[in-house]
Every structure is written in C-alpha cells, then in structure tokens.
Amino acid sequence: MRAARLFVVSVLAALSLAAQEPSLSGTWSQTKADDIAAAINATVKDMNFIKRPIARGRLTKLNPAYKKVMITVSDKEVVVKLDERTPIHMPPGGKTAPWTREDGEKFMVAAQVAKDQLVQTFKNEDGERTNVFKLSPDGRTLTLTATVKSPQLPRPLTYSITFGR
C-alpha cells in the first residue's frame, strides 16, 4: 500500500512539472540573427549624404547581435541582461523607471510581462526602442524583435534575434 501511494505521488509530481508553463526567466544563447547591418542600411538609405553615415554609425554601435540574454521575472522586478552589459532593473506592470545606459544617455524604461512575452520599452527625447521577447509555445526558443524609432530616422529600424536555452 505504501509503495502504491509513493508511486501515485511520484506520478502526480511528474505531471505537475510537465504541466508548468514555460518561463521567460533564464539564460538564453543566440541561435540565429537577422542581418542587422542590412536592416540599418535599409533604414538610413533615404537620408541625405551628410546624415546617413552618422545615423548608420550610431545605429550600428547601439544595435549589436546579442549573443546571450538573461531574464529574471518576479513580482518585484524584471531584470534583463544582454551579453556583458549592466543588467537593467525595471518595475513590473509597465511602470516606468529612470535608467542610464553605460554611455551616460538617460532613458525612461518599462517592462510589461504577459504569459509568453516581455515588452521592454526605452524612451528619451531622441526616440524610443521597443524590445519584444517572445517565447515559443514549447518554451525552447526566445525571439527578440527590436524596433527603434526616432524623428531623425525616415523609417523604424526593426530586426530579430533568436535564442535557445
């Protein structure tokens, strides 16, 4: 009888683990990335010859093909760390918080978490960037779609990077 109870408890525990929703939280490594240089060139192609190389250089510097992302989601905060950059701590629920990038540029940053998606938004007077981290249904793949908008750009810059566990 005791063995039967242990078996039932073991089966229920296994089913409970199998039924858990996949989580955004964890460490993810790049498996595929769009051609970001081509996306940048398409974004700046209609700019005049003076502004185009300046915009291309700045966009190239600020939009690398990240190799690793670490995400931590809790009731108290959302933390995103890209490659070796400083982690970004944000309040949950879409509330904005001040954040200063490593180069000193200041932003208001926000994080909105849904079951299978994290939307991270950076805004300042120069424009805004939105990172949408979308989890695949099986929880094995995370796709980052970045969109950069600015009044200085003729069109938004958009590209995607795919990560695996």
Outline where the language-model segments fall.
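Absolute protein N-terminus
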Residues: 1, 19-20
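Bacterial N-terminal signal peptides that target proteins for export
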Residues: 1-10
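Hydrophobic h-region of N-terminal signal peptides that target proteins for export
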Residues: 10-19
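PEST-like low-complexity, intrinsically disordered acidic/proline/serine-rich tracts
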Residues: 20-165
